[in-house]
Amino acid sequence: MVDTTVSDAELKRMNGLGVRGIRFNLAQAGATTPEMIEPLSKRVNDLGWHIQINAPAAKIMEIKDILNRVSSPIVFDHLAHIPEPEGTAHPLFGVVLALIDKGKTWVKLSGAYADTKVGPPSYSDSSAVARVYVQKAPERLVWGSDWPHPSERDNKPDDAILFDLLLDWAPEERVRNRILVQNPEALYGFAKSA
């Protein structure tokens, strides 16, 4: 956990340990705030880090101007929390696509359960959003499990079902390989796979 008081030496130390981003959890009151995004983005950009945003749709809409100004890559958690039942018709979806089009934004295909109104096993509403992301920008997607699902206290989702959703969202093996292997290599600076 970092805030704007973190030293450059500490950021460099963390970089040496493999840290590649700062997560702003704006879904809950906590250690990170929207006001920290720009100054921290500037400081970690030269390290090649990204800023990761976990926030409800209304909060992302509030900070969209900040996100348009930051220099570092952006990663949106949980399909960018596109609200259901509006899905791709919600204004946030257009905001996210516009940021993707700028070439520095990624979306994490994770948390299909986070904003669904339909639920398991198909999560058909969230799945529809994920499929459009795959169609429009497969080169800007990474997958995540969100295990151990800290936001879900009582009814933890089935991780096998969540992983299998990727077969529906990205039916072509080469696209899944891109999402699971090539894109994380690019985003996190992993060594290229053979």
PLM features per residue range, with description:
Residues 17-19, 82, 103-106, 157-166:
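Active-site gating loops and adjacent loop-to-helix segments of metal-dependent hydrolytic enzymes
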Residues 34-143, 192:
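Catalytic pocket-lining loop regions of alpha/beta-barrel enzymes
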Residues 113, 147-150, 182-186:
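A short, acidic, flexible beta-alpha connecting loop/helix-capping segment that sits on the rim
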Residues 4-5, 28-32, 82-85, 114-117, ...:
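Short, small-residue-enriched loops and turns at beta-alpha junctions
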Residues 1-47, 53, 90, 124, ...:
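Mid-domain alpha/beta scaffold segments of enzyme catalytic cores
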Residues 132-140, 154-194:
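Mid-to-C-terminal alpha-helical segments outside catalytic/metal-binding sites
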Residues 14, 22, 44, 78, ...:
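Conserved, mostly hydrophobic/aromatic
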